[in-house]
């Protein structure tokens, strides 16, 4: 059986509950993917895969369906602890070439910091496969310009969810790329 996704949507959520597992369930509910049996996969954005809206993607899902996703997930039960989960995306200019999805799930990073880091990871992975020369010690903004000026990377972005832990509760954050046939 061969399955190469043709569509993808991005979603995120946060959940809080006294139980760890229930906080994860609530994050899935906020992301609107709680009805799926999620199977996590690694980080390839398939060639010619179309990005669709969450609403459009949800229409094609059935309760209990085996659903493939790249998921970043983080949890804490520490009051005031900042957590984040990010999916970074880097897409090549040539749609017949695969792109990259990266997962990042830090403690102590803001939503912006986590998102930029995940985006940087994905773009750097793609740049190395495309033979783009760059200095890995340069900051993300400078490398992003090099990647895009090469003409080989057309777009990069991220989806990120962050939250602070609350006293007496588990807090879980997720960010997902849901891959569809």
From Swiss-Prot:
Cofactor descriptive note: Binds 1 pyruvoyl group covalently per subunit.
InterPro entries named among the record's database cross-references: Pyr-dep_his/arg-deCO2ase, Pyr-dep_his/arg-deCO2ase_sand, Pyruvoyl-dep_arg_deCO2ase
One Pfam family, short name: PvlArgDC
Residue ranges that the Swiss-Prot or TrEMBL entry lists as coiled coil: none
MF-aspect GO terms: arginine decarboxylase activity
Enzyme Commission identifier(s): 4.1.1.19
UniProt keywords, alphabetically: Decarboxylase, Lyase, Pyruvate
Keyword Nucleotidyltransferase attributed: no
GO BP term, pick one: arginine catabolic process
Co-factor(s): pyruvate
Protein name according to UniProt: Probable pyruvoyl-dependent arginine decarboxylase
Annotated source species: Prosthecochloris aestuarii (strain DSM 271 / SK 413)
């Amino acid at each position: 059986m061969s399955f190469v996704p043709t569509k993808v949507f991005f979603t995120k959520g946060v959940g809080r509950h006294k139980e760890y597992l229930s906080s994860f369930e609530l994050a899935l509910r906020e992301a609107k993917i709680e009805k799926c049996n999620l199977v996590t996969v690694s980080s390839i954005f398939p060639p010619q895969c179309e990005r669709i809206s969450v609403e459009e993607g949800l229409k094609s899902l059935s309760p209990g369906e085996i659903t493939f996703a790249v998921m970043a997930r983080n949890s804490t039960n520490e009051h005031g602890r900042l957590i984040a989960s990010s999916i970074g995306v880097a897409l090549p200019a040539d749609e017949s070439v695969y792109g990259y999805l990266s997962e990042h799930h830090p403690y102590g990073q803001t939503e912006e910091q986590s998102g930029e880091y995940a985006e940087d990871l994905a773009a750097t992975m793609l740049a190395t496969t495309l033979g783009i020369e760059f200095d890995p010690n340069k900051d993300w903004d400078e490398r992003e310009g090099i990647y895009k000026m090469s003409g080989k990377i057309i777009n990069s972005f991220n989806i990120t969810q962050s939250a602070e832990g609350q006293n007496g509760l588990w807090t879980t954050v997720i960010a997902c790329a849901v891959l569809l046939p």
